[in-house]
Amino acid sequence: MSFDELPKSDGYQEKLVSVTRTAKVVKGGRVFGFAVLVVVGDGKGKVGFGRGKAREVPIAIQKAMDQAKKNMVYIPLSGTTIFHEITWNYGASKVFMKPASEGTGIIAGGAMRAVLEVLGVQNILAKSIGSTNPSNIVRATIGALTHIGTPDYVAAKRGKTVEEVMAG
């Protein structure tokens, strides 16, 4: 499965994750509709996803991009990776992500790769388990990323200094 790079606007990176064709049977035959899933990010820690539905693909893509830009969230990153490993579920989809050392690259499959690329992550190990429905994978990935705690947050929560938290 390849992800199409869409034309850039507003400085955002946009990736088309999936296009689904649906058919409604009417008296005169079939009427086709399209549903698309798009992820949008700035490459610096902001990411969002959107779904668009229309009778034609370009209109559905535009609707999805507008929704994705409205639903963007900020994810704190540790340089080019994440702060700690995390597992997250959405529906029957389960994602596991682990920080990786410099030079590893994005080792992830399916829709997870698209989310991580537009987010700006460059080094990560990721695995999806269970359902590979692109919509659920994208939601699980963004859900996991939003629940990553920065060292400052974890230290404040535990009542310790950042150095004590980082030491173990």
UniProtKB/Swiss-Prot annotation:
Keyword Ribonucleoprotein: yes
Cross-referenced InterPro entries: Ribosomal_Su5_D2-typ_SF (IPR020568), Ribosomal_uS5 (IPR000851), Ribosomal_uS5_bac-type (IPR005712), Ribosomal_uS5_C (IPR005324), Ribosomal_uS5_N (IPR013810), Ribosomal_uS5_N_CS (IPR018192), Ribsml_uS5_D2-typ_fold_subgr (IPR014721)
GO BP of this protein: translation
The keyword Ribosomal protein is annotated on this UniProt entry: yes
A single cellular component GO annotation: small ribosomal subunit
An MF annotation (GO) of this entry: rRNA binding
Domain S5 DRBM as annotated: residue spans: 12-75
SUPFAM superfamilies xrefs: dsRNA-binding domain-like (SSF54768), Ribosomal protein S5 domain 2-like (SSF54211)
Keywords on record: Ribonucleoprotein, Ribosomal protein, RNA-binding, rRNA-binding
Similarity comment text for this entry: Belongs to the universal ribosomal protein uS5 family.
Assembly behavior: Part of the 30S ribosomal subunit. Contacts proteins S4 and S8.
Domain text: The N-terminal domain interacts with the head of the 30S subunit; the C-terminal domain interacts with the body and contacts protein S4. The interaction surface between S4 and S5 is involved in control of translational fidelity.
Chain's role: With S4 and S12 plays an important role in translational accuracy.
Protein name, as recorded: Small ribosomal subunit protein uS5
